[in-house]
Amino acid sequence: MARLVDLDKVRNIGIMAHIDAGKTTTTERILYYTGRLHRMGEVHDGGATMDWMDQEKERGITITSAATTCFWMPKFGNYIGVNHRINIIDTPGHVDFTVEVERSLRVLDGAVALFCAVGGVEPQSETVWRQANKYGVPRIAYINKMDRTGANFFETVKAIRERLGANPVPLQIPIGEGEIFAGFVDLIRMKGIIYNKEDGSTYDEVEIPHDLQNEARTWRINMLEAVSEHDDTLLEKYLNGEDITESEVRNVLRQATLKVTIIPVLCGSSFKNKGVQFMLDAVVEYLASPVDVGAVEGHHPRTEEPVTREPKDEEPFAALAFKIATDPFVGKLTFFRVYSGVLKAGSYVLNTMTGKKERIGRVLQMHSNKREDIDCVYCGDIAAAVGLKDVRTGDTLCDENSPVVLEKMVFPEPVIEIAIEPKTKSDSDRLGMSLAKLAEEDPTFKVKTDDETGQTLIAGMGELHLEILVDRLKREFKVEANVGKPQVAYRETIRKSVEFEGKFVRQSGGKGQFGLVVLRVEPLEEGKGYEFVDAVKGGVIPREYIPAVNAGVQQAMKSGVVAGFPMQDIKVTLLDGKYHEVDSSEMAFKIAGSIGFKGGAKKADPVLLEPIMKVEVVTPDEYLGDVMGDLSSRRGHIEGMGQRAGAQFVNAKVPLSAMFGYSTDLRSMSQGRANYSMEFDCYREVPRSIAEALQEKRTSKDSD
């Protein structure tokens, strides 16, 4: 199958937003207008195409990043009538699913940031925005739900500037808001667009309504000033009062958008079919193609030398696996983004993370949960492979003759865990395998066994995250399980640096064991994890035993010295040691490393840490006092408050341990009128009284 469009006519985009901003409906409309759908689904009736898991249809939220492809010919702008391929990843808006957002942003070249014209910039908008900044993803902003009572386009633009620190530049201003939203003024062409009242998919082009002419002129001047700052030629023309063409404005806007120095802003109401076609024109006009993004950087798996791959079909094949999913019909699906070269179905690829070669049986182009077999996939495309057994999220797939490791994705550690046990013997046999499959799909979901109780523990990013995974066990894997109460994932660290000797000796006839190490144990800054440095001089410990010391330290870190929780943010330096010609072994040095670390950590002022959550509560005025009092009673620290969309909002940092059951308490406190969102912020030291209680619990467990 030949390439359908040139590479510069490809757009890999994501739809990113807060929950309820209208992402799934907007994506449905895109598919409808681009000819992929013949009937539009609605989220509220569970018929939306991109929400393809049962739980998504029931809950009306998007959990997995469904991928789809479609084609669009712009009606206006520099690309009129030129066919473009748009690959869309629909990302979730609930904070428990930030991993889905993170991995989709890693492989995108641009994004449409959706905002609700009533709610404005919500907490999850900020979270997703920060993630997009991290990857330098160019964005356009689409202010949706303009037909809703309380819609305010200009307030939302102001909030994008103030809360996100962005530079939003409206290319349209609305004609009417709320129930009287009728269309918009195109500030580049200085024309009015009035949508058909019965069906917003058709519209009339008119002169700008008389009562909006002054406002439109003001906003056009604002737009031209903002755009001309990014191009000297345009600035000179603007200052000299010369005419500036549409094409010139669009060209400079495109360059500024690609550098993320301008965010073009559009408006619409996807549910009423208003604005989506113009948003598609803007996707083509202003967002990046793989050619604009340029070469991808990586390194050679053996030599660590830097390697670059140009976005060309002629280059050796290189792709990043960004998502693993289990499909009930075809089995394991590996979604991947091709950065260079071409891949044919049936060919072999090298996974440079495992060093293994695997055959790709089939290549599928995904349309939400429907799939289409294709012969080959080209540079810049997103597709799914069937038949890859050992691939994990973030692995690089490439041509075995030109190996490369692309940048590895980094995911946050889980903050909440629950015990899980099978209901029956047959469930018991399948539970382990099913949990392993789910963990393979989701890097923020971890499965482990409690060493003391033998219980299986599952850990994730929040209560909803784990609830949905347990639900999937039942629906997809037919495994019934009982779950315990959620537990906080406490951690331990140290506050000062110490040196300590770890010695393991067993010499009582026959071959003995001997290993002696001197370690320096010191704190690292928060979030750095673990670092091991070998500073041994003069061969006092043979090279082959040093990895064993590191392994012993890491083993000891899994169960801390305060209350048995995993330790983090620690640097361990191996300074000195001794070995015995006959009795030393890897095992002896592993145990010596473990003893040395435990002894050092106990003297290094060890402390207990707890996860602190960033919480935002939106509440009617009359419940504000109760909400703030309640947050304070949960050891919360109020960080700010204000007014938004006719309600009060409160920002606070609260320990996760105090937030279990909060949704029920908030509902009863506000008669169901307040809502909240919560995301992990950082780990902080636990107050002494709580630390003592946890230590006591640990001691009583040990004595049992």
Curated annotation (Swiss-Prot):
SMART domains associated with the record: EFG_C (SM00838), EFG_IV (SM00889)
Nucleotide-binding recorded as keyword: yes
Gene3D superfamilies for the chain: 3.30.230.10, 3.30.70.240, Elongation Factor G (Translational Gtpase), domain 3, P-loop containing nucleotide triphosphate hydrolases, Translation factors
GO cellular component labels: cytoplasm
Disulfide bond residue pairs: none
GO molecular function, one term: GTP binding
Localization per record: Cytoplasm
Alphabetical GO biological process terms: ribosome disassembly
Cited InterPro entries: EFG_II, EFG_III, EFG_III/V, EFG_IV, EFG_V, EFG_V-like, EFTu-like_2, G_TR_CS
CDD domains: EF-G, EFG_III, EFG_mtEFG1_IV, EFG_mtEFG_C, EFG_mtEFG_II
Residues the entry annotates as binding GTP: 17-24, 90-94, 144-147
Alphabetic keyword roster: Cytoplasm, Elongation factor, GTP-binding, Nucleotide-binding, Protein biosynthesis
Domain tr-type G: 8-291
Pfam family membership, one: EFG_C
NCBIfam families: EF-G, PRK12740.1-3, PRK12740.1-5, small_GTP
Protein task: Catalyzes the GTP-dependent ribosomal translocation step during translation elongation. During this step, the ribosome changes from the pre-translocational (PRE) to the post-translocational (POST) state as the newly formed A-site-bound peptidyl-tRNA and P-site-bound deacylated tRNA move to the P and E sites, respectively. Catalyzes the coordinated movement of the two tRNA molecules, the mRNA and conformational changes in the ribosome.
Family the UniProt entry places it in: Belongs to the TRAFAC class translation factor GTPase superfamily. Classic translation factor GTPase family. EF-G/EF-2 subfamily.
Name of the protein in question: Elongation factor G
Record lineage: Bacteria, Pseudomonadati, Chlorobiota, Chlorobiia, Chlorobiales
